[in-house]
């Protein structure tokens, strides 16, 4: 009984904490989404009922059913997100082909675009409440927004730290407040609740026909942030997120949207900001402050999610290695990526300056999230067919969801002409970077495979004791493109310097988020006094090689003593020289770009957190 009570308390505690992280983006959508939708058609009962019906069933079908019921089943050992889904498919399909890489890279690129747009539109829409307070304050909206964004990105380097504990209480107050404000309007015009009937959504399309598609781009804004429910699965778990959604977030959002619908039907004059119109004049300053705090929290969650997924991509070698700063001693997942933070800050502030209002930004917003949701639907559909063995009849569920999301995509297509091309361009540029990096590494792997054939004789000579050795031990760190240390063996062959004991360490990032300690180490004896050790990591884990080696030496038997402070680490630094010829899968500009990226990538000594005084770097030149 006590254990059950404790478990329920822990679940409620996690659900409460999830309010401050998971639901921030989707929870602040009422600030701009409804106002964006109603500008397309005249305000009358049938139009508002149709719009509210579309909003209601979008949140039910896409967010509640698709994500919380179906997609949640496709977790990768409790982890969610694009990379986790790709990992599940790779576990089942050993050689999935280039299509999975393509989808994964596009998905990551879209997340970068979302990381710029979400803080811009969220915070700008909150600060625009100043105009509702007084039209004279309109001139301060942009400067205040830019100041908030500056400090938001500035504080990333120190982490959220202690202030993070206040995120959930603020968001709970936010949801309660918007729910109450909406409810107060509904009781004055309860007829809006008829919009729950899907007849009004269908009737809306029958009346407006093809022109109704344009409104879907606006309706889709109510779901932006829905993908975060799955992406943050690893932090809070399924039960906590489902409880937080169905008990707090969803009811509050529906009350707020229906409340805005009730209000505009009672006040049919031109309403620029229907959300802030819900608030009484005496409460408006408090509402603006609360909205600003909520959007800052929502933006923080998106920025942290971008850091997290790009850290995973860096470990999986999908992007160049990035400098990773751990901002908390207690939360291992709390990281800061300086370069990414700068790119996001520059992009976000530029968007605010260019578009100037949340209404203009809304024209650019949504298409990236829409594409991300489509990718998720396709990947989970493949998992359902290949991993869950769903029959064709069940797979029709995904076909239905795909048709709905494609309809939303059709509604978002006109946004390409009014700013929607920006997130698509960001995603494309991200894809070019990642694909060029992938092609360059494939070329390096090809070159190392040739070296492996050349250096096989060294192992034979070591086995036959034909090579003289000097006392001591060398610990050689193998790069991802070098499966068994062929480049370092090549160096040894040229240098003729062989330690009495040599250990080659290869880091392998698996398609799972975490690797149990008992499965982490793999020892292979290559020759007398020459060992190859594989250390397996999950794609969400933090790499600290010296600490991992300490644990390894306790668990893996080696027939010689290890003196930690006398360990010498050998790493490779790669230099790429251009040949001027186009090679397979790489244009000349790609080779130059890859050379630039590999020169500026974080070196092994930093990435693996090796001791500077005990590390020797070996330079290797490759011709492309």
Swiss-Prot record:
Keywords: Cell inner membrane, Cell membrane, Ion transport, Membrane, Potassium, Potassium transport, Symport, Transmembrane, Transmembrane helix, Transport. It is a multi-pass membrane protein. It is found in: Cell inner membrane. InterPro entries: K+_transporter, K_trans_C, K_trans_N, Kup. One of its GO terms (molecular function) is symporter activity. PANTHER family: LOW AFFINITY POTASSIUM TRANSPORT SYSTEM PROTEIN KUP, OSMOTIC STRESS POTASSIUM TRANSPORTER. This is Probable potassium transport system protein Kup 2. The gene is kup2.
């Amino acid at each position: 009984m006590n254990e059950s009570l404790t478990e329920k308390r822990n679940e409620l505690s996690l659900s409460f904490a999830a309010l401050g992280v998971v639901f921030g983006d989707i929870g602040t959508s009422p600030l701009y989404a409804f106002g964006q939708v109603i500008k397309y058609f005249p305000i009358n009962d049938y139009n508002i009922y149709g719009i509210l019906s579309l909003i209601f069933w979008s949140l039910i079908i896409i967010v509640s059913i698709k994500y919380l019921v179906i997609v949640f089943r496709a977790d990768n050992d409790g982890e969610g997100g694009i990379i986790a889904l790709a990992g599940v498919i790779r576990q089942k399909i050993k050689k999935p082909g280039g299509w999975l890489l393509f989808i994964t890279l596009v998905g990551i690129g879209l997340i970068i675009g979302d990381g710029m747009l979400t803080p811009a539109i969220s915070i700008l829409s909150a600060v625009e409440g100043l105009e509702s307070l007084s039209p004279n304050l309109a001139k301060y909206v942009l400067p205040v927004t830019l100041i908030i964004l500056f400090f938001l990105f500035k504080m990333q380097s120190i982490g959220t730290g202690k202030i993070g504990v206040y995120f959930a209480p603020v968001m709970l107050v936010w949801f309660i407040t918007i729910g109450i404000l909406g409810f107060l309007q509904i009781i004055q015009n309860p007829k809006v609740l008829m919009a729950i009937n899907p007849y009004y959504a269908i009737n809306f399309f029958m009346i407006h026909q093809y022109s109704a598609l344009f409104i879907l781009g606006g309706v889709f804004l109510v779901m932006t942030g829905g993908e975060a429910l799955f992406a943050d699965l690893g932090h809070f778990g399924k039960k906590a997120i489902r409880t937080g959604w169905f008990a707090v977030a969803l009811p509050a959002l529906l009350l707020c949207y229906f409340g805005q619908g009730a209000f505009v039907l009672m006040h049919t004059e031109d309403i620029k900001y229907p959300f802030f119109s819900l608030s009484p004049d005496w409460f408006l300053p408090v509402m603006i402050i609360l909205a600003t705090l909520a959007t800052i929290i929502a933006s923080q969650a998106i920025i942290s999610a971008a850091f997290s997924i790009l850290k995973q991509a860096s470990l999986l070698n999908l992007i160049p290695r990035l400098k990773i700063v751990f901002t908390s001693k207690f939360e291992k997942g709390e990281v800061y990526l300086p370069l990414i933070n700068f790119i996001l800050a520059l992009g976000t502030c530029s968007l605010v300056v260019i578009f100037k209002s949340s209404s203009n930004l809304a024209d650019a917003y949504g298409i990236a999230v829409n594409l991300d949701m489509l990718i998720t639907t396709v990947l989970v559909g493949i998992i359902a067919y290949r991993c869950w063995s769903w029959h064709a009849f069940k797979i029709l569920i995904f076909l239905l969801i795909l048709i709905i999301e494609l309809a939303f995509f059709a509604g978002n297509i006109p946004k390409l002409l009014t700013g929607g091309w920006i997130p698509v361009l960001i995603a494309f540029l991200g894809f070019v970077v990642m694909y060029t990096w992938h092609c360059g590494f494939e070329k390096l792997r090809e070159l190392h495979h040739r070296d492996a054939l050349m250096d096989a004789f060294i192992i034979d000579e070591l086995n036959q004791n034909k090579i003289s050795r000097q006392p001591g031990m060398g610990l050689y760190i193998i790069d991802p493109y070098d499966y068994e240390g062929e480049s370092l063996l090549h160096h040894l062959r040229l240098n003729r310097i062989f330690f009495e004991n040599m250990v080659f360490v290869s880091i392998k990032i698996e398609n799972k988020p975490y690797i149990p300690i008992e499965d982490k180490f793999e020892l292979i004896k290559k020759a007398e006094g020459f060992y190859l050790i594989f250390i397996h990591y999950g794609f969400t884990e933090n790499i600290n090689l010296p600490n991992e080696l300490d644990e390894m030496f306790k668990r893996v038997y080696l027939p010689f003593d290890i003196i930690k402070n006398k360990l010498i680490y050998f790493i490779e630094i790669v230099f790429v020289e251009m040949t001027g010829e186009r090679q397979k899968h790489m244009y000349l500009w790609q080779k130059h770009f890859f050379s630039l990226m590999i020169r500026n990538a974080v070196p092994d000594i930093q990435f693996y957190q090796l001791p500077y005084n005990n590390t020797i770097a070996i330079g290797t030149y490759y011709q492309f």
